[in-house]
């Protein structure tokens, strides 16, 4: 009989088993891989890939992990099959040049049969068709009959990292759910009978460019056991979704929807499974610092959240619900990943924001798509799909998914064509790019040798003019007053790159002076943008290139300060923070980073203190060029999305910060002087921005602030230290005055409202009064409605107003006789508010609502009166 274990016990049992076999238990790597070329962690071996590829030495000979993974290539199959997921955990044991094939197979068998207690007769191993060694081990060492060992082709049982490099055969373990069907017809493709639960990869070859295989000096083992699959087997449930890893989330969603999973139809069960799977994905992604966006892994997150919301609606959930199911997921995952509980607030805030935003999109888009499908087209046109995307933010894949439910397809080619046409229109309308100059620069890059950059060590250098442009055309010479673009054979001028601005300075010749305002890079050519102040400049002229040293020093101070800022953010705010962009100028720095909430004032102060401490400690900075694999092995931070060559420049502030960076920096942190954060704000969904200053700019900033404080002291006739108390007193006085004004407004509203009693119209046994009051706030409106109903006796009162803030306010008050006739104030006023672009509700006898469009208020009130009179007569 198989062991009856929870998902958490299966995970811990696996790790403990291999720890007892000399493996070091390592924590799961982030879902955000170190390698910026990979979007998400998709396999248990990915964190060890540099070791398998020979790019990094292993710190231990044996390791075991439970690795969180996300794959979305089969997202449409999630919920449709028993075992497809976007989020899953891969339990793995790894050997780096230590044990190999025989030991890996023996331990996999021992774990399966003695620890998890799987019946041996239910386990079917597969091997690569040419791997006689593995076949013999299964037959002779383990004792599996030959006819049960399945030989498979390279497509199924041979692993490779690419067309060249380390590779090798693998052996997979399958569990047989129906052994009574016999061994004479073993078909591992029959996934209703067999489930692959453990894969053993034997990396023993290196494939060269000719496709030839040569034995590796150090042979490695890479294995993966699917946690969800093993849970299905040991817990005796029909699919992965009904294991204790996922089913509690499904039950939470079903409870919110008011349904029972077991009694639901297949379509409803599919939606519940999608919610159960995707919620685990989004919780882990946000916990690892990913925020929703329209690009890269941020878009994967956004798409998963949107699928959760939509499938929630498909099972009958009306409104927000995602944080409730996320809480169940967090409670399950925190056993192995405590960071999900630590970052609970961040996770739920991001989910709430995305859900609210998408609900608006979904309601509008589904309505329009429904209208399109009601016309019974053979296919949703590309233009219609693009209009939904462009006007309402309705994603193409969601249009495809909804259309597929009705048996329709979407014209993807037509969508792509409409998208391209819009992009072409945008490009043709964009007049800011000088295409002539750009074309000339591109031609220049094809004919001029790359510029030799000397600026890391030299601030002045001899140089020769390699090419010269004026007004987008290459010329042989240019005279005083000309705006020019100059290519030199070598230069100390830094070209704008990595967020750092280009250097300024001068080019001085025998009879010519050129002021350089900017330097850009076209391929590997440094283009110096400037103006000839004196003389004539010719191609071939020899010049002295001199950068503005004061400006460079300020830029360097700001650049090193930017590195310190990122280190401080990781230390103080969240270690998962990553750079999303930057600007390093002589007068300021700007740092964009992935984070979905404001950095608190207390954290800002702590960050400033930490950075100024590092500055005062006078850390020597170090730069070194090394292979990218070595840099990553040392822990150097890379910016996602940046493309790096085989060799990279590493800027290190020992013990503080280490980043891949091609910019210029101070030699010692003490050269920065001072650091001050000026602003912190959000600039996009999930992206925050800090603007800061360093060095002399801080003193200038403080002088300006000091002048402002002195001015305020004079105005308020208070010492600087007394200003907060003085302002607090004035605010309290203003608040008191506002309350008095509100009271007067309410009294005036009551006086005005009582003048409306004559407008009440009889409707059967009750009276109906619907009217608009000018400039009355919601509370005063509520008071007036209650007073009017009291005066009317039995009746219905609906009042509307547009207060000073410019939004619609509505109140409905119904007497018992009105309610007896089937009308409820909450539902009625909510429906009326929708006409004004809003909503609301409340009790049957008294309710409030609001709207965004004051221009629709008069029509909405007119409609309310007609409805009440018609229903109450």
Swiss-Prot record:
Catalyzes the attachment of alanine to tRNA(Ala) in a two-step reaction: alanine is first activated by ATP to form Ala-AMP and then transferred to the acceptor end of tRNA(Ala). Also edits incorrectly charged Ser-tRNA(Ala) and Gly-tRNA(Ala) via its editing domain. SUPFAM superfamilies: Class II aaRS and biotin synthetases, Putative anticodon-binding domain of alanyl-tRNA synthetase (AlaRS), ThrRS/AlaRS common domain, Translation proteins. One of its GO terms (biological process) is alanyl-tRNA aminoacylation. Its EC number is 6.1.1.7. This is Alanine--tRNA ligase. CDD domains: AlaRS_core. Belongs to the class-II aminoacyl-tRNA synthetase family. Disulfide bonds: none annotated.
